[in-house]
Amino acid sequence: MKRKLVDFCIISLPQHNERRDKLKNEMAKYDIECRVSHAIDGRKLLAEKYFSLFKIRSSKMFGRGFLTPSELGCFLSHKKALTEFLASGRKWLVVLEDDVLPKENVKYLDEMINSFCSSSVYILGGQDGLKSFSRVIMGRKSICGVRKVILGTHRWLYRTCCYCVDIKGAERILRLMEENSFFCDDWSYIVRNAKLDNVFYGQYFSHPLNLNSSSIEAERLFIAEK
């Protein structure tokens, strides 16, 4: 596939120069050029903005009905990246958060995307260290380097650190984001309410096991302790 049809986008807070440069350099080794979409730091939102958007209708986090500041920032950052993609004229979007690292098979990803299905979401890895991933059931047959997630077990997939959608899928997700807020990695809610056709999974990127630098994780731990 001609790369001009694929938008490889790194979501990164402006101050995280080192992290995004490392990822850009790693991707460049496989002849993949990435653009940067500067993330929105939810901790710096005005109170009026935060309280107008923090309530959610569906929750993966033990019934919690609101987003923390960093979770809302994540939501708005992905919404921004999707909006930028739809204005770009490209056909496919690969979203990467700046803490992932590519596996060697990422060199085939561009070619594989050419055979991906429309109106679906492709989770490209990033489940490292998550016990929930053992509950995900996938088809045995690997097509285009990915396997279909079946029996509704995509509810056990977490993180938005690496995924791929086409124009139709992006439009549907963005439309849902315009309607209300939700956890960015609530894939069950997204697939159901954005009316996406399928979820596929492939191992193209890894996520660090150490989450000490994650503001989202810090806020979740703070709430859990209360």
Question: Which residues does each PLM region occupy?
Answer:
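An acidic/histidine-cluster motif and surrounding catalytic segment
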Residues: 1-96, 100-226
